[in-house]
A protein has these predicted regions:
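Acidic, proline/glycine-enriched N-terminal capping motif
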Residues: 1-153
Length: 153
């Protein structure tokens, strides 16, 4: 089984949780992007990977070439001769995509436990045994994601 999908728009990195005296919460921008990832993934994949199935995930974050660059440098960027070394960090892009593919959970105060609000692509990101995250330049900003069963090769 293999899943491919594209999240249109500029890649976003996972932000640190915010902490007040009594509450810890995820910033709104991070939560919205995780929801966008979840909806895009669910719409492109109607099933769900098995609980114990090892997964291989490849994430390629494409950034627009800066408009301030010369034509020569733009062509180098598009030919992958010059790579993006700007924010967000590759690990934070990977984290937000991985968390977005998890099921959305919410604490039920009456039951005192977490309940699933919306399904994900897999049961938990602990199933991912191989992860590759790349940052590249392209004409339009987007994130391409490929998930498949990890064969251990």
């Amino acid at each position: 089984m293999r899943v491919n999908f594209t999240i249109e728009g500029t890649p976003v990195g996972k932000a640190r949780p915010r902490v007040t005296r009594t509450v810890t919460y995820t910033p709104a921008k991070t939560a919205r992007y995780e929801d966008l990832v979840r909806y895009t993934a669910i719409n492109s994949f109607k099933g769900m990977f098995d609980k114990d199935e090892p997964l291989d995930v490849k994430i390629v974050a494409y950034f627009e070439v800066p408009k301030s660059l010369s034509k020569k440098r733009k062509s180098l960027c598009l030919a992958n001769q010059e790579l993006p070394t700007k924010k967000p960090d590759a690990d934070n892009v990977g984290k937000i995509i991985m968390d977005g593919m998890n099921p959305k959970m919410k604490r039920d105060k009456r039951l005192h436990k977490m309940v699933e609000v919306m399904r994900g692509v897999y049961h938990d990101d602990k199933q991912v045994t191989t992860l590759l995250v790349k940052k590249r330049y392209a004409e339009r900003a987007r994130v391409d994601v490929r998930i498949k069963r990890d064969m251990g090769d």
